[in-house]
A protein has these predicted regions:
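Transmembrane helix exit motif
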Residues: 2, 66-77, 114-138, 255-272
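Selected transmembrane alpha-helices and immediately adjacent juxtamembrane segments
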Residues: 2-49, 134-190, 275-276
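Residues within membrane-spanning alpha-helices of integral membrane proteins
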Residues: 15, 58, 113-117, 121, ...
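Membrane-interface alpha-helices at helix entry/exit sites of multi-pass transporters
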Residues: 48-57, 80-85, 183-194
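Selective hydrophobic functional segments
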Residues: 55-108, 201-251
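Cytoplasmic-side transmembrane-helix entry/capping segments in multi-pass membrane proteins
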Residues: 80-89, 113, 135-143, 190-196, ...
Length: 276
């Protein structure tokens, strides 16, 4: 396992760059998700192996999701006592997914992911009134916990340790569940999504710690950046609400879809464009 001595293997300038990348990622992630699109490439550009980059990314991502969660709890938007079942099911789901992915070939599922992310973006794009205000709740208790916590948590855990960028749009899935099934407005749904994001991030981090791949010192520097960026983004979630969150989710979904499509079919796309 890497020690805090790894801090001295990275130049102060590079650490500063990673800190600000993490701050920007935390800001974006707290509003619409997708921060890993910035942090994973930055960590790999800094010279980390893919395994170390994914593990360290999970550490720093915990800073952002925990920061946002703390802010929303203090503002009394989220009540931990009301979310105990959702937290438990998310943790169980994320750990189950992370364990299962070690024994299952996920190639077919990866082909479906861009379509899922595109559908999320289109759904928010074509439903301008979605999450504008609270609506009647459709699902309660254990059924909701199984869907929002168990299923999305499993999805997040299944793809998270394997690919780094995944589960792509997990935060958007959480938010969508709170909007469509709980009837929350989009700001309130995003706040609750951060709580479940934090839960699945912690579950994923525990597995990476057991694997001994986390670069702790660099990860903690980025964690501080994530914490600060997420705090700023969380304030905007409550002050701007649906008017900010909806277009951000659409943009992040579009960028993430393009990234997923390129990862899966990059050579074919370049050949079709006559660039290869």
């Amino acid at each position: 396992m890497e020690t805090f001595n790894s801090l001295f293997m990275v130049s102060p300038l590079l650490l500063g760059v990673l800190f600000f990348v993490a701050m920007l990622a935390g800001f974006i992630d707290s509003i619409a998700g997708g921060g890993g699109l910035l942090t994973i490439p930055a960590l790999m550009a800094a010279g980390m192996s893919p395994a170390n980059a994914l593990a360290t990314n999970k550490l720093q991502a915990c800073g952002g999701s925990i920061s946002a969660t703390i802010y929303f709890i203090r503002r009394k938007v989220v009540s931990l006592s009301d979310q105990k079942l959702n937290i438990a099911m998310t943790f169980v789901g994320s750990m189950s997914g992370a364990l299962l992915v070690q024994y299952v070939q996920a190639d077919v599922l990866r082909q479906i992911l861009p379509i899922l992310v595109i559908c999320i973006g289109l759904y928010f794009l074509l439903m301008p009134k979605l999450g504008e205000e609270d609506r009647q709740r459709r699902m309660y208790g254990l059924p909701f916990a199984l869907v929002a916590g168990g299923c999305v948590g499993f999805y997040d855990g299944f793809f998270g340790p394997a690919d780094g960028f995944f589960g792509p749009a997990a935060g958007s899935f959480y938010a969508l569940a709170f909007v469509t099934l709980c009837g929350f407005n989009l700001a309130k749904a995003t706040a609750h999504a951060k709580l479940l994001n934090a839960t699945s991030n912690i579950g994923g981090l525990l597995l990476f710690i057991l694997g001994g791949k986390v670069i702790w010192a660099t990860g903690f520097v980025m964690l501080v950046g994530q914490f600060l960026g997420a705090r700023m983004g969380s304030r905007l979630v409550l002050s701007k609400g649906q008017k900010l969150i909806r277009p951000m989710i659409v943009i992040v979904s579009a960028v993430m879809s393009a990234k997923l499509l390129y990862d899966s079919h990059g050579q074919e796309i370049l050949h079709w464009l006559g660039m290869n």
